[in-house]
A protein has these predicted regions:
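ATP-dependent helicase/translocase motor core
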Residues: 1-333, 342, 346-357, 379, ...
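Structural recognition of the conserved hydrophobic beta-strand(s) that form the central parallel beta-sheet
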Residues: 187-188, 384-387, 463-469
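Interdomain helical connector at the RecA1-RecA2 junction of SF1/SF2 helicase-like NTPases
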Residues: 228, 475-574, 591-596, 604
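P-loop (Walker A) phosphate-binding loop of NTP-binding proteins
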Residues: 303, 339, 582
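Loop/turn-to-beta-strand initiation segments
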Residues: 333, 380-383, 406-409, 461-466
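Inter-Walker segment of RecA-like/P-loop motor cores
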Residues: 352-396
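Conserved RecA-like ASCE ATPase "motif II neighborhood" in helicase/translocase motors
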Residues: 381-414, 418-429, 443-454
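Post-DEXD/H (motif II) to motif III coupling segment of the RecA-like Helicase ATP-binding lobe
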Residues: 420-509
């Protein structure tokens, strides 16, 4: 039955997607290549370049090309992705292209023709070493890019068996699985679910789901033909989608860390491949923008644990180059607006990490001012990253609407949580103990302010806003949401908290919470006293008790002792606890009491 499943995929790839089916004897394990297809691609597309090389290398031309290509792929500074995107160069200055990009426009007929010359192929039952056989290997221009291990649920096996096969029975040190030089992703599939990894590490290999989601949870919706993962060959492994992944999405992330003992800096590289919802969100927005231009706003409701930073980065880079049917660039500038006081390093690294031309990205750091942002918006920078506070000043001036000759895509990061001075106000209140002068109104956030400003000026015809949030307010849904068949506004793309929890990216805190009740009695005279509004009075008294030092100290003792004795050892010592407070002012007071209690008791390892 597994063999029938495999043949179904092969037939679709061949007959519908235009793949070539190659024999497993064509595979060269030490190179992770099908060199015959590689050389055919080069001869069909770059005959003049090959002629130059043949004059130099004579009858060793093919050998020289293959060896140089393999050496470049194996370089730590390059890898397969860089070689596919940038090609290779020889001593005489001759360059060879290994993958032709799909052009954004149809103006350049030769570029379109070159793209059509890319050769996608597939092999079954591939031996990457003696005794170890892979079900399917996918190639582009003779270079292996994906492996697939298939399992059939009707035979009593599932994707979990495929994952264990990768972990226990596949040598991660072979050329096919060498990190960043071998395949870009290894897929584990059954009839219902798909998982992938970008690096085999034996038993510690981590597999991500690549599933659509079912009823807001994990898995995939039921497919009439009984194969719920058919989107893999019907969509993901089509030439256009694979090209999009190779050209615009997959990238190498470099992370710097420092050994706490030796203080030595360490750089680690990892290949970033999207989860299904990330790719879906980017492509959905692109498709709608291509059709409608900067006409619409979009709400991307992605839960915590969704990989939002990468999704924003991919979307920004693709929006910066997207063209309409008339071959016109839709957006002159993409503006990424983050809710931090300063643009955080994680977002900067993700934006800068995706390959782009020099000068294409500008980050408004803490030394920049609103005037610098205004200047950049009037200039030619394609992607600008700024804080929501600088952007708010731009919005108040209606600057985007005034620059009518330019079009803007504004990507708002975490639209629900941005605050306009309320955190600092809470800090000041706590430190000065001015409880009576503050009602703790935490609703004065920038999201509301932005909505108010947009509603004042209306939707600008040259501005499209894409709001990312995990928990949108009703006003946010009304402003950014799309109209559904029932006449209600909803998110343009949704990755729910339920799915994130079921897929294991966030913990369900409701499964692990402890209730601590505070009892107090309101004097009856408040209800009868005309000098007081009952609700207001009760709120003030409740707030006074809630923020009282003694009350907080008692709760903090229980929280920390419970965490220390029951929680912190879990998840290999990385477990965390969440404390939900009634206001930002309360959060600050709890933070100070946590620090005081930990220090007073000499606890280490808790922060």
């Amino acid at each position: 039955e597994r063999e029938d499943y495999q043949q179904l995929i092969l037939e679709y790839l061949s007959e519908t997607n235009g793949y070539r089916i190659r024999k497993n004897t064509d595979f060269q394990p030490k190179l992770a290549m099908d060199t015959a297809v590689l050389m055919e691609f080069l001869r069909n597309t770059q005959a003049d370049q090959l002629e130059k090389l043949e004059r130099l290398y004579k009858d060793r031309t093919e050998e020289t090309i293959i060896n140089l290509l393999n050496n470049e792929i194996l370089k730590d500074s390059r890898g397969l992705m860089d070689v596919l995107r940038e090609g290779i160069e020889f001593d005489n200055g001759t360059t060879l292209t290994l993958l032709y990009r799909k052009p954004e426009t149809s103006i350049n007929k030769q570029a379109v023709a070159n793209y059509e010359q890319n050769i996608f192929s597939v092999m079954e039952e591939v031996y990457h070493k003696e005794g170890e056989r892979i079900d399917l290997v996918l190639f582009v221009n003779g270079l292996a890019i994906f492996t697939v291990e298939l399992k059939c649920n009707t035979s009593g096996q599932s994707y979990e068996d495929a994952i264990e096969q990768y972990k226990q029975q596949r040598d991660a040190k072979t050329r096919l699985f060498k990190p960043r030089a071998g395949v870009l992703a290894a897929f584990a599939m059954d009839l219902n679910e798909v998982y992938f990894t970008t690096e085999l590490k034996g038993h510690s290999t981590f597999f991500n789901p690549f599933n659509i989601g079912d009823n807001y949870g994990k898995g995939n919706p039921h497919h009439p033909d009984g194969i719920n993962v058919s989107y893999m060959w019907e969509d993901i492994w089509t030439k256009d989608t694979l090209s999009f992944l190779l050209e615009r999405i997959i990238y190498i992330k470099t992370k710097e860390s420092r050994n706490p003992d030796t203080k030595k800096a360490k750089r680690t590289k990892s290949l970033i491949f999207p989860r299904y919802h990330q790719l879906r969100a980017v492509r959905r927005v692109l498709a709608d923008v291509k059709k409608n231009g900067p006409e619409n706003n979009y709400l991307i409701e992605h839960s915590a644990g969704s990989g939002k930073t990468e999704t924003i980065s991919w979307l920004a880079h693709t929006l910066a180059t997207v063209h309409n049917s008339e071959n016109q660039n839709i957006f002159d500038t993409v503006l990424i607006v983050t809710d931090r006081i300063v643009v955080d390093r994680q977002l900067q690294e993700a934006i800068q990490g995706i390959p782009h031309k020099a000068g294409q990205v500008k980050v408004m750091d803490d030394k920049s001012h609103s005037a610098d942002l205004a200047s950049a918006l009037r200039g030619n920078t394609k992607i600008i990253v700024t804080t929501i506070h600088k952007f708010f000043h731009i919005l108040q001036q209606d600057l985007l609407g005034k620059i009518k000759h330019k079009t803007f895509a504004v990507v708002i990061d975490e639209a629900h949580s941005s605050t306009h001075g309320t955190l600092m106000q809470a800090m000041t209140t706590v430190l000065s103990h001015k409880y009576e002068n503050s009602d703790g109104d935490d609703n004065l956030d920038v999201e509301s302010s932005i909505i108010e400003e947009i509603q004042k000026s209306g939707k600008q015809s040259n501005v499209s806003m894409i709001a990312f949030t995990a928990t949108p307010k009703p006003e946010t849904i009304q402003l950014f949401g799309k109209l559904n068949a029932d006449g209600h506004k909803e998110s343009f793309d949704l990755y729910s908290m339920k799915q994130a929890i079921e897929e294991g990216y966030i913990l369900n805190v409701l499964d692990n919470y402890v209730i601590y009740k505070t009892y107090f009695e309101l004097q009856k005279k408040i209800n009868d006293d005309p000098e007081f509004k009952s609700i207001t009075a009760k709120r003030k008294i409740a707030r006074f008790i809630d923020l009282h030092d003694t009350n907080i100290a008692q709760k903090v003792e229980i929280i920390i002792e419970h965490f220390k004795n029951n929680i912190m050892h879990q998840l290999d010592g990385t477990a965390k606890a969440m404390v939900v407070t009634s206001s930002r002012e309360a959060a600050v007071k709890y933070r100070y009491e946590f620090e005081r209690y930990i220090k007073a008791n000499g606890y280490s390892g808790i922060r």
